[in-house]
Amino acid sequence: MIAYKFLRSGRTGTFSEFQWPEPGVWVQSSGDVAACRSGIHACRTTDLPWWLADELWEIELADEVRADEHKLVAPAGRLLARVDGWTPQCGREYAEACALRARDQTGEALVRAGHAGAARELAGCSTLDELLDASRKLAAEIPDAQISLTILGDGALQALAVASSATAYIAAHAAIRLNGPAAYRAERVWQSRWLCERLGLRADR
């Protein structure tokens, strides 16, 4: 089965710190396969937003592949090729796109709460710096929307730091605050589609 795997720089496991060999070399799990504990972990395209890191690789999984929440796990796997399109610049663009999505969701929440003027002020923000400044200012001015606006500001701040995973997480939680769990899932789907389209990945993996 072909899937994807995020690694830190130098083909290093994000959590395990395992040093992956050159592409094409098989790695076998030393114990029983158990999600988040042992085995070769990878993800489908729908799982990508949960696992962002420095490098994205195409990986082949062998033997029995188990699907778990937001991940795949198998007894064996080998890296095939790095996805060159996932670069720091791509990460910045993704983080900015997520932050602007959070802007729109927060603006909708403000309109519902009777703060249409504040929503228009947010809608006029076209850069992350503008969004950060506006969200902080409005959070101080509108006590009943302080939490949502603080979350929005945190998302803009994380995007400025190119913390794309954190920005995506914040955007998804802005969605759940607005419209519940279904909106959270929809936001994660949007994030996955953005990555697939930008990186040229097949959405069925």
Predicted regions and their residues:
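Short, glycine-biased loop/turn motifs at secondary-structure junctions and
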Residues: M1-R205
